[in-house]
Regions:
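Catalytic nucleophile loop
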Residues: 86-89, 112-132
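Short hydrophobic beta-strand segments
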Residues: 37-45
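Catalytic-core regions built around general acid/base machinery
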Residues: 101-116
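C-terminal and late-domain segments of enzyme folds
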Residues: 1-33, 46-53, 57, 134-135, ...
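A short, aliphatic-rich alpha-helical micro-motif
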Residues: 79-80
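Glycine/threonine-rich flexible loop motifs
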Residues: 92-102, 168
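Conserved acidic residues
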Residues: 36, 83
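An anion-binding catalytic pocket shared by soluble metabolic enzymes
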Residues: 8, 66-73, 91
Length: 245
């Protein structure tokens, strides 16, 4: 089977807590004792130095060294030598463009899918782990050469998923309506709406919903379904043609 190991987190910060505070135990369990250093990809934010400082402080507090890819003179070589990869949140379009600009799409895919290097993403970093960034919440502030992403899983994710607020007077589309519009297009893959506080752990061909909140699954042509932490989503990994059912 596929050696991939992924921890796809909806959000970096949960209300009332610090950076990655809500998932730090999951991070330690995921990386374990074999990983000594993590390669951080700060491309989703403009101030990469400040972003790297924040991430380094957190990971060092968990017992891991952190190298930021933007400090490397050869980003491709940094990926090839990495023990684990963490792509942080920010603007998904800016992030994906930088991954293409630095020729990292295929390199990261190979390291994760063939070499089994652990991959962690939060928010935008979770978006780019999927088929495409079509279901991001972000504004297209820059123009990547493609919306196709890393494809580490054969479906899409909507991080920071928000349920409709019955008391709101806002007349714009809800998140659910926007995802339904996406699924009006042919051959669009499943979309997993990850609420803040939720994350998906993928180990080989097994995927499990973790965290403190649930998720909402959208399949093309089907009514969305509600899922609690602990749900086995392995079927999403096995069958990428669920939208045709």
């Amino acid at each position: 089977g596929c050696p991939r190991r992924l921890l796809l987190v909806s959000n970096s910060t949960l209300h009332g807590g610090g950076y990655l505070g809500h998932c730090q135990q999951h991070i330690q369990s995921f990386l374990g004792g074999k990983v000594k250093r993590v390669l951080f990809v700060p491309y989703a934010l403009h101030d990469r130095d400040a972003y790297a400082r924040t991430a380094r402080e957190k990971f060092e507090s968990l017992g891991y060294g952190l190298d930021s890819i933007h400090e490397s003179c050869d980003p491709v070589e940094a990926v090839r030598k990495s023990e684990a990869i963490f792509i942080g949140g920010g603007n998904t379009f800016r992030l994906l463009k930088a991954l293409y600009d630095n020729s990292l799409i295929q390199e990261i895919r190979k390291r994760v899918l063939e070499d089994g290097v652990p991959y962690m993403g939060s928010s935008a970093g979770t978006n780019v782990a999927t088929v495409s960034i079509n279901t991001t919440n972000d504004m297209p502030i820059v123009y990547p050469p493609s919306l196709q992403a890393l494809g580490l899983v054969p479906f899409n994710i909507n991080p920071h998923y928000l349920d409709p607020d019955d008391k709101s007077t806002h007349m714009g589309e809800t998140r659910e309506e926007r995802i339904r519009q996406y699924h009006e297009e042919p051959n669009t893959p499943p979309v997993l709406g990850l609420r803040e506080g939720a994350m998906l752990l993928v180990e080989g061909d097994k995927a499990t919903l973790q965290g403190v909140t649930g998720a909402r699954l959208f399949l093309r042509g089907k009514k969305p379904t509600e899922h609690e932490p602990g749900t086995d989503f392995s079927f999403l990994l096995i069958d990428s043609n669920l939208q045709k059912l």
